[in-house]
Amino acid sequence: MGTVSSRRSWWPLPLPLLLLLLLGPAGARAQEDEDGDYEELVLALRSEEDGLADAPEHGATATFHRCAKDPWRLPGTYVVVLKEETHRSQSERTARRLQAQAARRGYLTKILHVFHHLLPGFLVKMSGDLLELALKLPHVDYIEEDSSVFAQSIPWNLERITPARYRADEYQPPKGGSLVEVYLLDTSIQSDHREIEGRVMVTDFESVPEEDGTRFHRQASKCDSHGTHLAGVVSGRDAGVAKGAGLRSLRVLNCQGKGTVSGTLIGLEFIRKSQLVQPVGPLVVLLPLAGGYSRVFNAACQRLARAGVVLVTAAGNFRDDACLYSPASAPEVITVGATNAQDQPVTLGTLGTNFGRCVDLFAPGEDIIGASSDCSTCFVSRSGTSQAAAHVAGIAAMMLSAEPELTLAELRQRLIHFSAKDVINEAWFPEDQRVLTPNLVAALPPSTHRAGWQLFCRTVWSAHSGPTRMATAVARCAQDEELLSCSSFSRSGKRRGERIEAQGGKRVCRAHNAFGGEGVYAIARCCLLPQVNCSVHTAPPAGASMGTRVHCHQQGHVLTGCSSHWEVEDLGTHKPPVLRPRGQPNQCVGHREASIHASCCHAPGLECKVKEHGIPAPQEQVIVACEDGWTLTGCSPLPGTSHVLGAYAVDNTCVVRSRDVSTTGSTSKEAVAAVAICCRSRHLVQASQELQ
């Protein structure tokens, strides 16, 4: 694969002069020296110029996107993404049409790559003056300006060469990831290093930009430190996680650790094409890099994930919200933050690991010993979220080797389930990010453990809604997960509840902001449950003093969660939906002016029960947890006056947060309780016991 050239300036030229430059010997040679072969453009001019002269103009319904971080932008190179239903042949036809219409206006363009296997579209070098024209082309969905991505490692001590300190008998995981292929998109790799010799195949793929301040590319062998180190972390003989995993290297970062979104997209398409041509076992793609938020980068990751590929990425080293970066913000990617030997967030000078709701878990990322490219027996220590992501890629390879049939959703749930819980000091994170950031550090499961019997659930937070009264927030589960309950949270306490609704054939959790509120979060409880069938039963406001009630009336269905929403601004003594331990077991009860929603599910052997923990007066936090063997599916507050900020699940614990009444001037003595719905599958438990 050829190298993607860096950006250059473009000038509009009169059409006769343009043709002279293209067709004249001297002009052709000069242009080829700078920008390559323009034969395709000449053919496009000859074949399409006349036919498109009278083509009708289309209203620009497509959108334009660019990186929010100006220094990372690469104007002059654009990814043109076509609509989902576009036939693959239209990619090349649309590209030729753009070239022909640009030439009519006196502009040079160059098609750098046409995507066929990853997404419909193409990569083009052109003047920004042509964007309006390109956005009006038929089939165009959106256009994104190219931008930079960066390796996410910080050298801890480059001068020190350290021998590996691990003993072989300390780490003998089952199968060692031998059934899994790991693709590493990074710098090149020193494949003859003793840590990885015979385990790595360096492909001929290369798509990197020129280095800053230069007009050339250094040989890959001269700058393979970052990739070599990460390859050793993933599958090194002494210091690797998955010692048996095979690894393939694609070069998308230059010697300065810098690449482009477009170059990485071409690398992902290379992987997809390889997968189609020669299907193999489970694939893990390690993306130890980060750039600004990119719609097209995230879309490409989604495509690859839905094709069965597991993608693991670095959260980023900017001490910032990971949702502002790609591919860390892609929901289908497993995003990894970095911790040190004390399980605390990694600090890198004035920066450090990224955090927030887009991070799935953390992993070791400080002072990590691995292979050094200084010599074939050298080792070096490095730090960063790249190293953390490499650990999780190795763990993923181990799990997939033990259970090759695992889906991405199942793998993610297992990574979360087996992580060390509540070991990170949350005070390191900004206050508004603490509740959103998972307190999880990755760990391998017990070597003899098969978790097929376990009911797995995780908590998914939405983005923060706007502050307007009608603003809403939506939380979604992954493709193979089922939404079992929905809750909401507002730091101001001003919200209008939440509900489960259908959207695009999937259940989603929608939370509603209230007048005077600062915004709200929707919180989905997403679970893996075979053969599950769920529905929502709703009761409108009862208008009676006894409150609104709704229950699961279908035979065999059990209550997995309750939610409510209301239109009035202040319910006063609002009582949100709860499952009470006394009375009807499958019933949600709420305020008479609220609509109450019961999430009712049926699955083989599914059984649920309620746990409630209350305190006699309002406190800032009340919790209740499910016992071992049971999984939290629903979390609600009781009673839920204006002091209650909301409820959410942390691992297997239901947390209800309230405002400190001492700061509000309130004299309320109303009790507050956390109500948890705990479920398990007798069918899965029995299957596990039979295996034992």
Swiss-Prot record:
<dbReference type="GO" id="GO:0034189">
    <property type="term" value="F:very-low-density lipoprotein particle binding"/>
</dbReference>
<comment type="subunit">
    <text>Monomer. Can self-associate to form dimers and higher multimers which may have increased LDLR degrading activity. The precursor protein but not the mature protein may form multimers. Interacts with APOB, VLDLR, LRP8/APOER2 and BACE1. The full-length immature form (pro-PCSK9) interacts with SCNN1A, SCNN1B and SCNN1G. The pro-PCSK9 form (via C-terminal domain) interacts with LDLR. Interacts (via the C-terminal domain) with ANXA2 (via repeat Annexin 1); the interaction inhibits the degradation of LDLR.</text>
</comment>
<keyword id="KW-0964">Secreted</keyword>
<dbReference type="GO" id="GO:0005769">
    <property type="term" value="C:early endosome"/>
</dbReference>
<feature type="region of interest" description="C-terminal domain">
    <location>
        <begin position="450"/>
        <end position="692"/>
    </location>
</feature>
<feature type="disulfide bond">
    <location>
        <begin position="323"/>
        <end position="358"/>
    </location>
</feature>
<dbReference type="InterPro" id="IPR015500">
    <property type="entry name" value="Peptidase_S8_subtilisin-rel"/>
</dbReference>
<feature type="signal peptide">
    <location>
        <begin position="1"/>
        <end position="30"/>
    </location>
</feature>
<feature type="disulfide bond">
    <location>
        <begin position="223"/>
        <end position="255"/>
    </location>
</feature>
<keyword id="KW-0378">Hydrolase</keyword>
<comment type="function">
    <text>Crucial player in the regulation of plasma cholesterol homeostasis. Binds to low-density lipid receptor family members: low density lipoprotein receptor (LDLR), very low density lipoprotein receptor (VLDLR), apolipoprotein E receptor (LRP1/APOER) and apolipoprotein receptor 2 (LRP8/APOER2), and promotes their degradation in intracellular acidic compartments. Acts via a non-proteolytic mechanism to enhance the degradation of the hepatic LDLR through a clathrin LDLRAP1/ARH-mediated pathway.</text>
</comment>
<keyword id="KW-0732">Signal</keyword>
<feature type="active site" description="Charge relay system">
    <location>
        <position position="226"/>
    </location>
</feature>
<keyword id="KW-0053">Apoptosis</keyword>
<dbReference type="GO" id="GO:0005737">
    <property type="term" value="C:cytoplasm"/>
</dbReference>
<dbReference type="GO" id="GO:0005770">
    <property type="term" value="C:late endosome"/>
</dbReference>
<dbReference type="InterPro" id="IPR000209">
    <property type="entry name" value="Peptidase_S8/S53_dom"/>
</dbReference>
<keyword id="KW-0256">Endoplasmic reticulum</keyword>
<feature type="disulfide bond">
    <location>
        <begin position="562"/>
        <end position="588"/>
    </location>
</feature>
<dbReference type="GO" id="GO:0006915">
    <property type="term" value="P:apoptotic process"/>
</dbReference>
<keyword id="KW-0597">Phosphoprotein</keyword>
<feature type="modified residue" description="Sulfotyrosine">
    <location>
        <position position="38"/>
    </location>
</feature>
<keyword id="KW-0068">Autocatalytic cleavage</keyword>
<keyword id="KW-1207">Sterol metabolism</keyword>
<keyword id="KW-0106">Calcium</keyword>
<dbReference type="InterPro" id="IPR010259">
    <property type="entry name" value="S8pro/Inhibitor_I9"/>
</dbReference>
<protein>
    <recommendedName>
        <fullName>Proprotein convertase subtilisin/kexin type 9</fullName>
        <ecNumber>3.4.21.-</ecNumber>
    </recommendedName>
</protein>
<dbReference type="Pfam" id="PF18459">
    <property type="entry name" value="PCSK9_C1"/>
</dbReference>
<feature type="disulfide bond">
    <location>
        <begin position="457"/>
        <end position="527"/>
    </location>
</feature>
<dbReference type="InterPro" id="IPR041051">
    <property type="entry name" value="PCSK9_C3"/>
</dbReference>
<dbReference type="GO" id="GO:0005783">
    <property type="term" value="C:endoplasmic reticulum"/>
</dbReference>
<dbReference type="GO" id="GO:0034185">
    <property type="term" value="F:apolipoprotein binding"/>
</dbReference>
<feature type="active site" description="Charge relay system">
    <location>
        <position position="386"/>
    </location>
</feature>
<dbReference type="Pfam" id="PF18464">
    <property type="entry name" value="PCSK9_C2"/>
</dbReference>
<feature type="active site" description="Charge relay system">
    <location>
        <position position="186"/>
    </location>
</feature>
<keyword id="KW-0458">Lysosome</keyword>
<feature type="domain" description="Peptidase S8">
    <location>
        <begin position="155"/>
        <end position="444"/>
    </location>
</feature>
<dbReference type="Pfam" id="PF05922">
    <property type="entry name" value="Inhibitor_I9"/>
</dbReference>
<dbReference type="GO" id="GO:0004252">
    <property type="term" value="F:serine-type endopeptidase activity"/>
</dbReference>
<dbReference type="GO" id="GO:0009986">
    <property type="term" value="C:cell surface"/>
</dbReference>
<keyword id="KW-0720">Serine protease</keyword>
<keyword id="KW-0967">Endosome</keyword>
